[in-house]
């Protein structure tokens, strides 16, 4: 499993990560080149295949500058939110980057708005109201909506719809791939009979 391999590789870097304060996990859906980063940063490949990869970007500083990764055709990038350099953050970072990759969005630079984006992604199949999410984060509904729109450039409802549509598309594409593989295996089995 790719996720297990990524986490295993990252776990082996625990001593090396002690020299860095912050990190972001990037996933790409294609064979990708490592972009240039600032001298106080490092780009660590965790998993690299023809069909994609996972990279950990770490910084000795308390912040990491945002990289605008190209999103062209089937060549997509997903990045987690910025985390403090702790290996135990990696499972959540992997989940965050996966949502960003397949739902086609970037997390807000605002820590609180990014946290809300992740919450909405994790709970995309649930029914919830703006009021209930606002209350969960101790905001009034109007303030919550304003804060979210300012942090993401879209309304909460638009963001949830965007995530659900892209996730649905991902599920359909994966189902089609599995069906094609299954048909090929069945055709081979029938031919063998």
Regions found by a protein language model. Give the residues of each.
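Hydrophobic helix-rich structural segments at or within alpha/beta enzyme and signaling domains
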Residues: 1-110
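Short glycine-rich hinge loops at helix-strand junctions in the catalytic core
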Residues: 42, 125, 176
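Residues at or immediately flanking beta-strands
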Residues: 74-78, 127-129, 178
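Short, Lys/Arg-enriched, Trp-marked, Pro/Gly-tolerant hinge/linker segments that flank
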Residues: 87-91, 98-118, 122, 131, ...
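Terminal helix-turn-helix DNA-binding modules in bacterial transcription factors
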Residues: 118, 122, 150-189
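Helix-turn-helix DNA-binding elements, focusing on the entry/boundary residues of the two helices
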Residues: 130, 141, 145, 179
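Short coil turns linking two alpha-helices in DNA-binding domains
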Residues: 140-141, 189-190
């Amino acid at each position: 499993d790719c996720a297990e391999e990524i986490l295993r590789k990252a776990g082996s870097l625990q001593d090396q990560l002690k020299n860095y304060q912050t990190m972001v996990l990037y996933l790409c859906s294609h064979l990708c080149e490592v972009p240039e980063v600032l001298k106080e940063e490092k780009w660590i490949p965790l998993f690299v295949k023809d069909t994609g990869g996972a990279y950990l970007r770490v910084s000795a500083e308390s912040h990491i500058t945002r990289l605008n990764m190209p999103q062209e055709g089937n060549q997509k990038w997903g990045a987690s939110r910025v985390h403090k350099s702790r290996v135990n953050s990696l499972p959540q970072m992997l989940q965050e980057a996966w949502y960003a990759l397949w739902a086609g969005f970037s997390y807000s630079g605002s820590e609180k708005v990014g946290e809300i984006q992740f919450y909405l992604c994790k709970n995309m199949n649930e029914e919830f109201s703006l009021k209930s999410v606002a209350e969960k984060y101790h905001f009034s509904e109007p303030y919550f909506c304003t804060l979210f729109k300012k942090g993401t450039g879209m309304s909460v409802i638009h963001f949830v719809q965007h995530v659900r549509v892209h996730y649905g598309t991902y599920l359909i594409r994966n189902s089609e791939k599995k069906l094609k593989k299954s048909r090929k295996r069945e055709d081979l089995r029938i031919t063998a009979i």
